[in-house]
Amino acid sequence: MELNAGGVIAYISSSSSASSPASCHSEGSENSFQSSSSSVPSSPNSSNCDANGNPKNTDVSSIDGVLKSDRTDCPVKTGKPGAPGMTKSHSGMTKFSGMVLLCKVCGDVASGFHYGVHACEGCKGFFRRSIQQNIQYKKCLKNENCSIMRMNRNRCQQCRFKKCLSVGMSRDAVRFGRIPKREKQRMLIEMQSAMKTMMSTQFGGHLQSDTLAEPHEQSVPPAQEQLRPKPQLEQENIKSTPPPSDFAKEEVIGMVTRAHKDTFLYNQEHRENSSESMPPHRGERIPRNVEQYNLNHDHRGGGLHSHFPCSESQQHLSGQYKGRNMMHYPNGHTVCISNGHCVNFSSAYPQRVCDRIPVGGCSQTESRNSYLCSTGGRMHLVCPMSKSPYVDPQKSGHEIWEEFSMSFTPAVKEVVEFAKRIPGFRDLSQHDQVNLLKAGTFEVLMVRFASLFDAKERTVTFLSGKKYSVDDLHSMGAGDLLSSMFEFSEKLNGLQLSDEEMSLFTAVVLVSADRSGIENVNSVEALQETLIRALRTLIMKNHPNEASIFTKLLLKLPDLRSLNNMHSEELLAFKVHP
């Protein structure tokens, strides 16, 4: 069965056999995090089930659907082509092709698709009450390690609520309830119209003034700015609050773009391969004395590498630049370099590694992604992004997914370096910096490596260089997460963002004030707003007739959050059931 993106749930048969899971996808689970219950269940107009537990014909969805116009609603369809084999018995039991769907929280029989996952009535009501009443549960006496099952789900409410969040239940679905489809579409149109008006109001004069301003020009005083020719929205511009100076926004755009280019080595390789000539020392703007990002204290508590496992040799994040003679790669290989600065991959990136020379001895495909480092007569081949399709039949699905996770280890270091060079990021507290990186690294990698997903060939290229078809990966156990990642990448690639736009969007993804554990929310919000304004300015400058691109980019943020939750769930299952 073909899997679509988002909200795809792993289904377990009634025998609870771990060896025979099935993956399916209903219309109601499309694009993740839809609610199938109301925030006010006592209201007859806000519930999608009748007294017998059967679904009504009312087509409604959560407020999250307002952000995605292509979502559909009813979580359990009967007799419709979009959900073949999906039935719901008179007892409220949801089945798929004869298999009983279990609650993802406690394992009880699921009554439907509630708040983003299939759940039973008990867990649905528990989660709704927890969010609506903002209940602070008593601290767990077992270090929050209680196993939540049907028989004991009421013993530890803190662990039960934690389990609800970990499996993907959406807070927003409870907070906003459900909205009829027509109302959802109307709100979406109004939101897009308001966004377009806001951008036109704030930046109507910006496009004309760009040609008059030099890069080093200081900001123009408001009085002089109002004297310049403006479009028809002149009066509205004068009345509105003036945005930050264009010079400041251009400076932010330039700094973030340089940080993205300098710390995204995979993107550099593709730019170098696509151009016939390369300027000397392209992408080598990293300062010689880069202060290391010290996360050692956080590793002891399951820090960044708890999301991206790596070997012991890759966990040194506190080293400084030194004139070493060899570079350690994640696979254990070392590259000796003469008269160059290099360092362990888990430290900072070298300011100058070697002269990159295309390999003549490799195949045409490999030569575009392979480079030689000349070290006094010794030649070391480095092929980090070989495109040669290769599937090892001897490897199990677990080993392949472990390789997939391991291959991202150096990319995680790039995200850390990128974050350090975002204007204002280093001004945040160390605690907030670490929390933003821990929570947002996967989402940044998802944006950066969207090009690894080839929609035409239906393939995924691992960072180790191996290419797998989607069908092969599905046969190895990949399901909902891979399908969601593939669809997200296809949509993001369809926007055809420039390097500058991708850089700003990546920074916006990382700096999110609603991450858990943030201490100084106001500081993070201020930085986030600065980046969003810069992104809006850039989009309006590059696409004056396509204002919807900015809206579409912002709508990708909840998609990324959904993918992040799904990834955390898969990683947890990966650790518990290797």
Swiss-Prot record:
Residues carrying Phosphoserine: S46
Modification after translation (UniProt): Deacetylated by HDAC1. Acetylation and deacetylation regulate its transcriptional regulatory activity. Under more reducing intracellular redox conditions, Cys-383 is in its heme-bound state, which is optimal for recruitment of the NCOR1/HDAC3 corepressor complex and repression of target genes. When subjected to oxidative stress conditions, Cys-383 undergoes oxidation to form a disulfide bridge with Cys-373, also triggering a ligand switch that results in release of bound heme and derepression of target genes.
Transcription listed as a keyword: yes
Pfam families: Hormone_recep, zf-C4
Primary location recorded for the protein, binned into one broad class: nucleus
GO MF term (any one): cis-regulatory region sequence-specific DNA binding
Role description: Transcriptional repressor which coordinates circadian rhythm and metabolic pathways in a heme-dependent manner. Integral component of the complex transcription machinery that governs circadian rhythmicity and forms a critical negative limb of the circadian clock by directly repressing the expression of core clock components BMAL1 and CLOCK. Also regulates genes involved in metabolic functions, including lipid metabolism and the inflammatory response. Acts as a receptor for heme which stimulates its interaction with the NCOR1/HDAC3 corepressor complex, enhancing transcriptional repression.
UniProt name for this protein: Nuclear receptor subfamily 1 group D member 2
Natural source organism: Rattus norvegicus
